Amino acid sequence: MKKFLLCFFVIGTSLTSCSKFNESLNDDFTNANEALVSDFNTPFPVINITVNQNEFDNMYLNYTEGIELEAFLNLYRNNELLISDELVEIEIKGTESATYNLKSLGVKFDDTFKNENNIVVSPSNLLPHHSIEKIKAFRLRNSGNDFKKTLLKDISYTQLAINAGLDVDLTYYEPAIVFINNSFSGIMNLRTEGNTNGISRLNDVKKGAITLAKINDPGEVEKKDGDFDRIDNFLNAIEEENLSYLKQDIDINNFIDYIIFHTYISNVDWPYNNVRFYAIEDEPFRFIIYDLDWANTRKIDKHPLAFINNPTKYSAKDAIKNPITDLFTILYQDSEFKNLFNSRYQYLVNSNAFSSEKFNAILDHNYNNIKQYMPIHLDKYNDIGSMIEWFRNIELLKENFKKREESINDLSPLF
């Protein structure tokens, strides 16, 4: 057992809840190498994956090789075993984040799993056009670029989009405590997938009905599944600035909400990267929100139109050409689309759908979910440092969101 000896000072006025935070750090906690599954009596999932240890170690060592392993999944909630020895396939996921000591895992069921009573994933809210009754695969995510900061960023920003009731497609999250062969692995984010399997289950259609493409850094299109000719026709229409074709080929309301959310949260790792768009049969293309780890890190003073026209993590001169920026530019020249976009954006700002108060409430909820167990995680991984550094990083998330909100409000009316 370990105890924290706290000695810290306040930077500026940001650590306004130090006494409250201090109270949660006074108890003993279990060493990571002593932790047992039964130590975690949580309403969110506690997962134990049983796999050949030598094969797992080899997969970890050779994480770029796409190695897939057969394994067995046990899932607990409130110390109750709800999934027992379910056959799954696991593999390492991620690019840069796959270099971390705790790596993201893709978990795929042998057969589509009936998510009765939301056993696998149980989000607090579900958008009305989505279903999570069937799950083929999910991801145990290390929080990507936020792994060394809070573990809470992607899950919190995604929840903000859900709570705002946007007409978007996205992935659903819960925190999860993960064990490998009864050995504590870490606190992760359990996330539904945004690939063809995930999108087909989300829309309750067969996988074969989905046409899906990705845009990866630096703006390269990767056709994944379905009707590749249709994807080519869509991209050609963007190149040819075929407005009438494009207005018919995409879901306009979805695209508007998709652009609004990304530009409001200043997601600089988009849209030359982290883009997925899909269609069901002959229906219009829709766009998927995911991987928000870079939100509100840079360019938080930019007008939304300036932001979308200069997509890059770096300076404006390095802006990366991509189909999404080109598509928006074409559509925004159309008065009907322009009026719809401008009025929708201003409505969401005026209605406080993305207010800092709402974001902070989400972040505080997610913080409270895992704070009791973070000392064990930090005992195994020193990337964040200490509990007080973790708390400071959470406060910085709030501060940066507030700065973006103030920047948008200073620009209002936006159009």
Where are these regions (language model features)?
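Conserved ATP-binding subdomain of kinase catalytic cores across diverse folds
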Residues: 65-221
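Bacterial Sec-dependent N-terminal signal peptides
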Residues: 15-37
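Sec-dependent N-terminal signal peptides
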Residues: 4-12
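Short boundary motifs at domain starts and secondary-structure transition points
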Residues: 35-40, 128-131
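N-terminal processing/targeting junctions
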Residues: 11-17, 57
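Intrinsically disordered, low-complexity segments enriched in glycine/proline and serine/threonine
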Residues: 5-6, 26, 401
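Positively charged n-region of N-terminal signal peptides that target proteins for export
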Residues: 1-4, 19
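Middle-to-C-terminal accessory/interaction subdomains
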Residues: 42-50, 54-66, 71-73, 78-96, ...
